[in-house]
Amino acid sequence: MSKSLGNFFTVRDISKEYDLQVLRFFMLSAHYRNPINFSHDLMEAAKNGLDRIITAVTNLTHLEKSAKDSAMTEDEKKVIDSTKDIYGKFEAAMDDDFNTADAISAVFELVKLANSNSSEDNTKEYITALKESIVTLADILGLKVIKEEELLDEDIEALIACLLYTS
């Protein structure tokens, strides 16, 4: 791609089709020293990967609301202990010349661990620990994986009305 050939994209062009979080994830998928070949297929793959992480965190958030408030079981503690190994892989990848592609694979390991080892029967402490482990590593990479609740237009209008009447 080159500007003189006219076969390039600006961030503004890409943002019309994709969320900028997807672009960030796409760029993190490759080593910073290597050139990145842009294609819509690769952007779709990045979108799917990011959606997979967001879905895992969203599912854990829903489980967290209905989880029981008791102490972690021994099996749950073993799973949480295994996250420390994944943290080590993440840290090693980042120490290896900022290898974000390998760091992302560590995040996907956590997602796989969370998806296969979480259910409505787990404790709140356990579900929260799994969720926080994914969110923490994603946050280090600059990825926002917790979905913000959007306010509806009527809610916004009601809040504005409250502010106007209290002033």
What are these language model-derived features?
Residues 2, 6-167:
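Structural preference for alpha-helix termini/caps and helix-kink/transition segments
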